[in-house]
């Protein structure tokens, strides 16, 4: 599932392509919105909120969430028609939403109601680290990975950053949140990670952008830990796959 930084720069790409332009075509391929046609409306704002995208045009707001496989593409690209959920065109460009997990057309005045449940947005103007830290610490018995992935705690952490944060703070993904010494440091580090990667596709949490050296543990099962050399372990039995170093990460 895309992380908050991916959605942030997807929004930036859509903003550059569509903002300030008049829609000449709007084809929403969702039965509920099949009759919606925003042709003639001007796209005047594109924004992200956590992992959610909003394209505002006229009195409407197109709300999408990429979920596991979704993407937005700019320009003419070859995609199987059955995968296309929406087509937006202007006089000089085209944006298509592919395999979007959520796609709905909302009233612009109330579109933020769809994301009112989210915690502080790691890449948003409303980022409040102390609120996020309090949210994280609210249930000390909760497994750390589960809490980090809960968008009500803070919006934008996906499975990559979840696993990387667990490693950086030396805790197993299953360790209770209450074992963290300083939840504020954890949410601040989460913010730093996403902020540094918000404008690039070559994500890194190690600070090394060279191929194969960008991440600490995620996707590295069976490879040596970058700190101690122990082989990275993985568990695919849960809802989300987890990765950890059995030496550098502990339960308490």
Curated annotation (Swiss-Prot):
Keyword annotations of the record: DNA damage, DNA repair, DNA-binding, Glycosidase, Hydrolase, Lyase, Metal-binding, Multifunctional enzyme, Zinc, Zinc-finger
Zinc finger (FPG-type): 216-250
Catalyzed reaction equations: 2'-deoxyribonucleotide-(2'-deoxyribose 5'-phosphate)-2'-deoxyribonucleotide-DNA = a 3'-end 2'-deoxyribonucleotide-(2,3-dehydro-2,3-deoxyribose 5'-phosphate)-DNA + a 5'-end 5'-phospho-2'-deoxyribonucleoside-DNA + H(+)
EC assignment: 3.2.2.-, 4.2.99.18
UniProt GO BP: base-excision repair
Positions of disulphide bridges: none
GO molecular function, one term: class I DNA-(apurinic or apyrimidinic site) endonuclease activity
Cofactor binding, note field: Binds 1 zinc ion per subunit.
Entry cofactors: Zn(2+)
InterPro entries: DNA_glyclase/AP_lyase_DNA-bd, DNA_glyclase_Znf_dom_DNA_BS, Endonuc_Nei2, FPG_cat, MutM-like_N-ter, Nei2_N, Ribosomal_uS13-like_H2TH, Znf_DNA_glyclase/AP_lyase
Impact after mutating residue 2 to C: Loss of lyase activity on an abasic site, rescues trioxsalen sensitivity of a deletion mutant, loss of glycosylase activity on 5-OH-U
SUPFAM superfamilies in alphabetical order: Glucocorticoid receptor-like (DNA-binding domain) (SSF57716), N-terminal domain of MutM-like DNA repair proteins (SSF81624), S13-like H2TH domain (SSF46946)
Key word Metal-binding present: yes
Active site: 2-3, 51
Phenotype seen when the gene is deleted: Greatly increased sensitivity to trioxsalen (also called trimethlypsoralen, it intercalates into DNA and forms interstrand adducts and cross-links after UVA exposure). No change in sensitivity to other DNA damaging agents cisplatin, mitomycin C, UV light or methyl methanesulfonate.
Residues that, per the record, bind Zn(2+): 225, 228, 245, 248
PROSITE patterns noted in UniProt: FPG_CAT, ZF_FPG_1, ZF_FPG_2
One Pfam family from the record: Fapy_DNA_glyco
Summary of subunit composition and partner proteins: Monomer.
Family: Belongs to the FPG family.
Function: Involved in base excision repair of DNA damaged by oxidation or by mutagenic agents. Acts as DNA glycosylase that recognizes and removes damaged bases. Involved in the repair of psoralen-UVA DNA cross-links. A lyase that cleaves single-stranded (ss)DNA but not double-stranded (ds)DNA with an abasic site. Has 5-hydroxyuracil (5-OH-U) glycosylase activity on ssDNA with 5-OH-U, with 10-fold less activity on dsDNA, but weak to no uracil glycosylase activity. Has weak glycosylase activity on thymine glycol and dihydrothymine residues in ssDNA. Cleaves the DNA backbone by beta-delta elimination to generate a single-strand break at the site of the removed base with both 3'- and 5'-phosphates.
Protein name: DNA-(apurinic or apyrimidinic site) lyase Nei2
Lineage summary: Bacteria, Bacillati, Actinomycetota, Actinomycetes, Mycobacteriales
